[in-house]
Amino acid sequence: MVEILDRTYGAQFPEELECHLDLQNASANCCKFNRWGSIVAVGCTDGRVLIYDFMTRNIARTFSAHCLPVSCLSWSRDGRKLLTSSADNSIAMFDVLAGTLLHRIRFNSMVTFAMFHPRNDNKAIVLQVNKQPTVEQFSPRIQTVLANDTPGSSDESASCVSYDRKGKYIIAGTGKGKLLIYNAETLKCVAWCKQNTVQQIRQIIVPMKSRFIITNTQDRVIRTYELEDLLHQRGQMVEAKYKVLDMVNKAAWKNVCTDSDGLYVCGASTKAHSLYIWESNTGSLIKILHGNKGEALLDVQWHPTRPIILSIAQGTVSMWTQAHVENWSAFAPEFQELEENEKYIEKENEFDMEDEDADEDMTSKSQDAEDDIIDVVNVRPEDYLASSDEEDCNIMKPARNLESGPLWYIPVPLDIENADNDQRLPDDIRNLDNLLNPAWVASAKGYELSPKSK
């Protein structure tokens, strides 16, 4: 059945390199899609943040966010705010549409991770080097430290952290392979468990439409757990529901991403510019994407709704997409390719408005369909863009003036070329002295030029 769907609709994972984003002499360090994949933010090593319109691949905004490399990016739920963290020990929040800085918070050590609350852009979780994660409230300013008060783990610091998809829980991983789950409201630890390894958990990934969480561990194994199973644990060792790893090269993973449904998992190798794609439920390796040799991967992100992956290596953002092959016979089985031009002979009644041989039932149905009223004024939200936990798809409808609601795209003003050269010549010839030949102007006015002036 899967093979039939793949032949009909195509594989839902990237297959080849399509292009590179134009960074305008910048060196990329990390990237992040907004919730719908219409805008992508790219953090650079010089502290700048470039905002791209993903449809046109052009830069819509540029923020001078930090003075050192940007380490992490996070979008708010409505796409109007962008949170950045940097090696300069600070995080910053920007209004994407206005291009203004809203908040900046400085810390005592380098910030490696920052993430908006999935449902509240006034809160964010921040992780510093060798410190416990903190929950930051921007207005009013409140900071709360997530303490590790589990038995026998007082000296363990968190190595990674993330919200679940609804923002009800905070999931933290430690340097000894433990998973801690906090209530996002009370900030109390409600569950903790151990992986079957004591290696450091480097990353926690939560798919947008899945009840699973994925961990990237130092032992080079990518594990998938069901969140509901972890909520009932009190220090027990938990076996992963699915595991994927590189059986041949034993590669370690710099970064891991997944599609919105959690059906595919992509691992970015630390040794080379290679992307490994597995089926998460079977663990079978289905594709390896190879970039240029000698490049080291820094980040990888999967598009929220399309089979597109962005990878960053050596400061360059590469876009991997599907291999599109034209197959017209899939749309019209009777389609035939011609070796040379032929004159087409029209069949009788082929292009008539009414088919005399058609059934009466079909004619009545077509007439009823023509009488249907089509709404061309109101915007109808698409369900496939919403995650599985959406309460109401109408919250995805932006306002017509873009002052409220989700920000799907950034409007760009028209750039009229040679606007200054559109000059109208005045009727009075006295105003043309600067534009015309002086001799011609003097002759038109009835003056005679001396030989020296010629």
Swiss-Prot record:
PROSITE patterns xref list: WD_REPEATS_2, WD_REPEATS_REGION
DNA-binding listed as a keyword: no
Gene Ontology CC terms, in alphabetical order: MLL3/4 complex; nucleus; Set1C/COMPASS complex
Biological process annotations from GO: egg-laying behavior; germ cell development; heterochromatin organization; programmed cell death; transdifferentiation
Disruption phenotype: Strongly reduced di- and trimethylation at 'Lys-4' of histone H3 in embryos and adult germline stem cells. Mutants also display defects in egg laying and fertility with defective germ cell development. RNAi-mediated knockdown disrupts development of the ASE left (ASEL) neuron, causing it to adopt the ASE right (ASER) cell fate.
Top-level taxon: Eukaryota
Keywords: Chromatin regulator, Nucleus, Repeat, Transcription, Transcription regulation, WD repeat
Protein name: Retinoblastoma-binding protein homolog 5
